[in-house]
């Protein structure tokens, strides 16, 4: 046996690090990533499955936390001194960058989860020195423990920062639960270098679902597109990425101007003075990064973005001064000590009007970013900016509302908000649903309605298809969508191709007739919503399909959904929920950004499904004949609308040989190996459950002779889970 080698770093024995060798993904980079269906497992959560954050938060003295935060704002620490004696601007940036990763296309990113604590976000170039902000918060987090999550505390700190500098915020809702590991489901881009921008094509068309111009930035490059200091070109980037975060032009101007009413940027010297980011820093740094060798490494020697400006004469006080400075001077391009593009008033204008952050004897001229000047030189932004400049109260209200939206956009409906500062006003971006205002149906009513639905002439497949179409819009990322509200009958969902509008209209007409008859005759003001009836129709269909297979099951159903109206529904906002692909219905548009099977995994993750739940749902929905357009692809049974495990049995049958029948290899024929006769057709989504080793292992469970009962039970449980994903009203 060879002698053990000494480690040059530790002087100890060289050890093999578990998981450090070449991984399966290294060998097979196109392999499906099923790990995203098991992230945030209870096994990684130190608080245990019995922990209830809503209960813990209810014990929190929010006023006391806010007072501690206010005290912290002006308690400058030697290890990271506060600019202008106030940490408020730093905490605003921290909260902004926590929430600002949100994007509308898939609802991922945002403040919920406190992901800024983990890679890659904790080490993004745009988040330089926010590690210090979180360390400043640690004594407060330590004091209140699990009564307030990091995710909530970071946003609350931003709110208190604003309030402590004289701004009246719109409100605060708690309820963001921390995650305990990096989130692998979020696609941040394909670049392999920080600040790379391979995400563009054509005429600067930004890849979906991304909402930042470069890898490692929150929004835009403050120096201008690709570092080109062109304010008008910067406006195009700003408009695009802010729209992808659900912000219109007014909200965009309000956020930029409101955020830049405070604080300064930092570029005292070249970025070459900064050490590695937190995830690459030495163990002795204890999770901090960007150690600065320039001067003292802090205070006036701080390096963050590389830009060195202060926007206004009052950097720790709410005012309209950002607009006053923006419009009062003519601007000329200059460079920071770090070599970054920035703007100063022409000549010596403005000199001595802005305080120094650490030396009361020094004064400076104000400065602007290229992206700030976009608010003056883009004609649409300029008109809004001047209106805000001339109407300070209008600006303050717009910023308060936009900040609230920024920091709460990924939380879902208002029923999820916690605490005494939740605003009473319903906002359309919260996707409001009317409160229950009538007695709910009971078990006897449910049985009666099921019988009427089954006698209506609607097929099992159509009932199941419609219920799935309503519920499967849900996204666990930003808690939007779902069956509650019955928005499937409203624009835009009623016209989505995947929902088969003509068939959908017929189903809704029949269900509305059943609803009307019941509500007209039910005693005591009892009523059933269309949202409940749509879900109940799916339950009835599945129970009948199980009965067809010789099983008696009851699909769990809890009434209480309500019907939203068109005025409560922002059609443009809901448009992003339209699926490009839904493997559960064997639906896919042309020119997908990923292979259909990868789109299935993405959809399953947004539906908060595990790999076994996804697998059993696919098998069940295929035999229930719920394909888009009623195609037979993947319907591996001669008994459609009968809830059997036939899909798995026939998929894994070695008597079938599969061959592609399209150039794009998205459709396959399964032929009898002996006779050559066509048995089945299937899509990539169907065949992946026999091809992928992990999914095949799951499929085998349900294909076994003793897997029939388990298949029925697991399908019903997974179905009920999807139908109730948006029932936040049940956790009150």
UniProtKB/Swiss-Prot annotation:
Post-translational modification summary for this protein: Formation of the three residue Trp-Tyr-Met cross-link is important for the catalase, but not the peroxidase activity of the enzyme.
Enzyme class: oxidoreductase
Site location (Transition state stabilizer): 93
One Pfam family recorded for the sequence: peroxidase
Needed co-factor(s): heme b
Active site: 97 (proton acceptor)
CDD domains: catalase_peroxidase_1, catalase_peroxidase_2
GO molecular function annotation: catalase activity; heme binding; metal ion binding
Superkingdom of source: Archaea
Keyword Oxidoreductase: yes
Matches recorded under PROSITE patterns: PEROXIDASE_1, PEROXIDASE_2, PEROXIDASE_4
Co-factor: note: Binds 1 heme b (iron(II)-protoporphyrin IX) group per dimer.
Crosslink position(s): Tryptophyl-tyrosyl-methioninium (Tyr-Met) (with W-96): 219-245
Cross-link Tryptophyl-tyrosyl-methioninium (Trp-Tyr) (with M-245) mapped to chain: 96-219
UniProt keywords, alphabetically: Heme, Hydrogen peroxide, Iron, Metal-binding, Oxidoreductase, Peroxidase
Residues reported to bind heme b: 260
SUPFAM superfamilies in alphabetical order: Heme-dependent peroxidases
Annotated EC: 1.11.1.21
Quaternary data: Homodimer or homotetramer.
Function, as annotated: Bifunctional enzyme with both catalase and broad-spectrum peroxidase activity.
Assigned protein family: Belongs to the peroxidase family. Peroxidase/catalase subfamily.
Name the record gives this protein: Catalase-peroxidase
